[in-house]
Amino acid sequence: MAFSATVSQLSSLSTISSSLPISSRRLPHRSLPQFTVKAEAEKEKQSTQGKSDGEASPAATKTPKTLPKKPVYSMKKGQIVRVEKEKYLNSINYLSVGHPPFYKGLDYIYEDRGEVLDLRVFETGEYALVGWVGIPTAPAWLPTDMLIKCEKLVYERM
């Protein structure tokens, strides 16, 4: 019964909509002439600007696109590094962690087992993402000025 009531309501709506005038059911395309007028006005503006620009200098209108230069890094990815102990202990990286006064950092960061995973230039300077080989810890972003380049990886698995 509910289905038959719904069908009868739909059929009554269709008879009401068919009795309405056509102009109220369909929206006329009033915006179409406005777009053509705007396009014609823009063409006129461009033609007047083209004449004035053509008289001034045609080379000034064509400017080559310059791509941003790639930054030059002091290190490269995959390079083996170690952290300079004195610079690290006096840095904001060490002081912001809140270590106790007697704590002098983890020994493995001062050994030749750090690998540069990524390099970025931030507002505060050039930083390297350093991961330590054989140490199950997360990599850390450290300033490149406190890193010392090493020739080879000095690491013995225990």
Curated annotation (Swiss-Prot):
Biased composition (Low complexity): 56-70
Keywords: Chloroplast, Membrane, NAD, NADP, Plastid, Plastoquinone, Quinone, Thylakoid, Transit peptide, Translocase, Transport
Enzyme class: translocase
Gene Ontology molecular functions: oxidoreductase activity, acting on NAD(P)H, quinone or similar compound as acceptor; quinone binding
Region feature Disordered, mapped onto this chain: 33-70
Record's bilayer topology term: Peripheral membrane protein
Gene Ontology biological-process annotations: NADH dehydrogenase complex (plastoquinone) assembly
Entries under InterPro entries matching the protein: NdhO
Domain of life (superkingdom): Eukaryota
Function: NDH shuttles electrons from NAD(P)H:plastoquinone, via FMN and iron-sulfur (Fe-S) centers, to quinones in the photosynthetic chain and possibly in a chloroplast respiratory chain. The immediate electron acceptor for the enzyme in this species is believed to be plastoquinone. Couples the redox reaction to proton translocation, and thus conserves the redox energy in a proton gradient.
Protein name: NAD(P)H-quinone oxidoreductase subunit O, chloroplastic
Species of the source: Arabidopsis thaliana
Classification lineage: Eukaryota, Viridiplantae, Streptophyta, Embryophyta, Tracheophyta
